[in-house]
């Protein structure tokens, strides 16, 4: 077997990835397929933390643009991430992988509160952890939450799994001639406003020298990224 490049990673998933063809809500069949991908990664023996968005259920920024109070909209979006986290937890545990959901907003009846030292201990014991409810604060995206948890938990890399194979010069779902970047620097990504993650998340990764790997969430790409095979786009320093 190939040697793992990373021992502990944070995996960022979009909420839309759980919706499947229905585009909204949680599709159990899609969740099952996604968890099969995650299972193959977990079985490598590395420590894995997940951050999942909530856009399949509610998008705070979109609601704010239509007149809803921004803080209220963002809190609703955070609650949506908890629903997604519980769906992933249930499916992973049915596959035999002990999983803990840790929420930045206290709701002890359904999940644990996010406490950094507790999260680290779960990882050390071989449990998958899912960090839910973003940062617990409005005005911060789940991309920023992913970068923050990545630093706090001392992960070796931040992997963003998407519906496409990496980062392109234009939307590959709309343009057949779109070209994929294999490598980008943090500076280039910020300067060219390449929409990998929001600028706060990229800056956090840059300041802490954490590579960001963007790859497809299916077809074994996450596993190949762990093994250092660079299946998508890697963003790092010079």
From Swiss-Prot:
The keyword Cytoplasm applies. InterPro entries: AceGlu_kinase-like_sf (IPR036393), Asp/Glu/Uridylate_kinase (IPR001048), Uridylate_kinase (IPR011817), Uridylate_kinase_bac (IPR015963). It is found in: Cytoplasm. CDD domains: AAK_UMPK-PyrH-Ec (cd04254). Inhibited by UTP. It catalyses: UMP + ATP = UDP + ADP. One of its GO terms (molecular function) is ATP binding. Keywords: ATP-binding, Cytoplasm, Kinase, Nucleotide-binding, Pyrimidine biosynthesis, Transferase. ATP binds at residues 12-15, 55, 59, 162, 168, 171. Pathway: Pyrimidine metabolism; CTP biosynthesis via de novo pathway; UDP from UMP (UMPK route): step 1/1. GO terms for biological process: 'de novo' CTP biosynthetic process; UDP biosynthetic process. UMP binds at residues 54, 74, 135-142. The keyword Transferase applies. Its EC number is 2.7.4.22. One of its GO terms (cellular component) is cytoplasm. Gene3D superfamilies: Acetylglutamate kinase-like. Catalyzes the reversible phosphorylation of UMP to UDP. Belongs to the UMP kinase family. PANTHER family: URIDYLATE KINASE, URIDYLATE KINASE PUMPKIN, CHLOROPLASTIC. NCBIfam families: pyrH_bact (TIGR02075). Homohexamer. This is Uridylate kinase. It comes from Lawsonia intracellularis (strain PHE/MN1-00). The lineage of its organism: Bacteria, Pseudomonadati, Thermodesulfobacteriota, Desulfovibrionia, Desulfovibrionales. The gene is pyrH.
